[in-house]
Amino acid sequence: ILGVARAESLGKRNRIVTSLIEHKAILEPCNWLHERGFDVVYLPVDEHGVVVLDAAREVIDEKTLLVSIQLANNETGVLQPIKQIAEFAHEHGAWLHTDAAQAVGKISVDVSDLDVDLLSISAHKFYGPKGIGALYINRAIQGSRIMPLTYGGGQEKGIRPGTLNVPGIVGLGMACELAENVLVEEGIEINRLRNFLEECLEKKIAGLRINGKNVLRLPNTSSLFFPDVDADVMLLNMPNLMLGTGSAC
């Protein structure tokens, strides 16, 4: 995000479009750009946690430089309509970036089908080593300028100088390979277990709300709302369960 924005340097296109539910890895760079003169627009989501397409269509225009929308939300697991948003972006000559950190390793991710220009992943999200990630850059825009954030050697086509982390790169590649080998089989089983858990809870707890239940979600994520219950107090009374009150990461 910062590299694309720095290359434009407040030229004709100075609008960045993102959503209100992004990870801080997206929101904080966007806030930083806003403080330096960029027009940053935050898209709302509907009651299911899905980005409102009509809002996206309305704000993406000829001034838009980049649209950055996550592929899957890290709290609800809800999948976002990346393909449609990419279409809006490309109609106006803007680039589409998606943060796919939560999705890769859980569902099939096809950059050609999504029609994204930029896609970022992080290895530790799918049992790879910590401290290594990857950025996919569509071949169609590889000749365009993305400014580096640091300077030094010419590694990684000059975008990220520095000695390559070979063990991390190998680990990321192997983690991708292993995840791909079991993606469908494990996805079906985890989805079955998730649904079974939610069905049991719904039968026993009146007023329970499952966030994103009626839209496409990651199979491994369940976001639950318990009415009239303090979530932190509830967790303290269930020390043997791995639960969180916020981001799944």
Where are the language model's segments positioned?
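Pyridoxal 5′-phosphate
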Residues: 1-249
